[in-house]
Amino acid sequence: MKGDKIVIQHLNKILGNELIAINQYFLHARMYEDWGLEKLGKHEYHESIDEMKHADKLIKRILFLEGLPNLQELGKLLIGEHTKEMLECDLKLEQAGLPDLKAAIAYCESVGDYASRELLEDILESEEDHIDWLETQLDLIDKIGLENYLQSQMDE
């Protein structure tokens, strides 16, 4: 099915954001695990896999619309050097992607591509949930202190 060129451009933009997130979250997961923060590492690993699932759905949709998925233009990863900075980097990445998602959803709606819109709405919901989780973790650090937070993330 021949898709709207601008829809495909939007889908590729979101795909690029997802590819950045996959790599960033995967590296952060391994860093957390290396530091003995098993709970945080496991959660971050699952976030990376979740982003990979989003990327997979986007690739399938782009191909269905007879477009070419762009996996070559990767943006910059935001890698923190300590736990709080890593959480802040992840939050910044998620927040930076929201305007792209909302613009893509609005455009898909305007041209009647409801399947792409629904896919993007599902991704938006997931990203908003992740933002909420990240904000909660940063609030916990502020409330209980970094040392107590780190201790709470050590064992499963």
UniProtKB/Swiss-Prot annotation:
InterPro entries the record matches: Bacterioferritin, Ferritin-like, Ferritin-like_diiron, Ferritin-like_SF, Ferritin_DPS_dom
First and last residue of the signal peptide: none
Cellular component terms (Gene Ontology): cytosol
Keywords for the protein's UniProt record, in alphabetical order: Heme, Ion transport, Iron, Iron storage, Iron transport, Metal-binding, Oxidoreductase, Transport
A GO MF label: ferric iron binding
Transmembrane spans: none
The UniProt record lists the keyword Ion transport: yes
Gene3D superfamilies named among the record's database cross-references: 1.20.1260.10
Annotated residues for binding of Fe cation 2: 51, 94, 127, 130
Residues the entry annotates as binding Fe cation 1: 18, 51, 54, 127
Entry keyword Iron: yes
Positions annotated to bind heme b: 52
Domain Ferritin-like diiron: start-end pairs: 1-145
Catalytic reaction list: 4 Fe(2+) + O2 + 4 H(+) = 4 Fe(3+) + 2 H2O; Fe(2+)(in) = Fe(2+)(out)
Annotated cofactor note: Binds 1 heme b (iron(II)-protoporphyrin IX) group per dimer.
Enzyme Commission code: 1.16.3.1
Highest taxon above the source species: Bacteria
Cofactor or coenzyme needed: heme b
GO aspect biological process, one term: iron ion transport
PROSITE patterns given in the database record: BACTERIOFERRITIN (PS00549), FERRITIN_LIKE (PS50905)
Pfam families: Ferritin (PF00210)
Family of this protein: Belongs to the bacterioferritin family.
Protein task: Iron-storage protein, whose ferroxidase center binds Fe(2+), oxidizes it using dioxygen to Fe(3+), and participates in the subsequent Fe(3+) oxide mineral core formation within the central cavity of the BFR protein shell.
Subunit structure: Homooligomer of 24 subunits, arranged as 12 dimers, that are packed together to form an approximately spherical molecule with a central cavity, in which large amounts of iron can be deposited.
Protein name: Bacterioferritin
Organism from which the protein derives: Azotobacter vinelandii
Gene label: bfr
